[in-house]
């Protein structure tokens, strides 16, 4: 929150728990699996998803960013359940994003607001 306040922006950091904050609110997102950090391109995919969510919701940057990160983490969980190996995992993440409905995201998002 302090960094977001100092720079008048939304800050996002990913890791075991993903954090998305503005000056007053912080989402702690618990979707995803550790294996995602070893897959080349997941960060790039996430950047594109965040950009598209913010573009579609420019007045809700904090919530759009949190939703995008929930979506990517949930897609990683779904892909892991269907995983055949490291090479196919990346493709399964893309498939999970493509096939995810708004209700799937609403049911599967794991977060708390602080």
Residue ranges and their predicted role:
Residues 1-4, 61-76, 93-94:
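Short, well-structured alpha-helical segments that form the helix of a local strand-helix-strand
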Residues 1-37:
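Conserved phosphate-donor
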Residues 9, 13-16, 47-58, 99-110:
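Hydrophobic transmembrane alpha-helix bundles
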Residues 18-32, 57-58, 81-84, 98-100, ...:
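N-terminal loops that bind phosphate or other acidic moieties
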Residues 35-40, 83:
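Short, surface-exposed loop/turn motifs that are enriched in glycine and acidic residues
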Residues 40-71:
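Short, small-residue alpha-helix embedded
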Residues 74-114:
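Charged C-terminal helix
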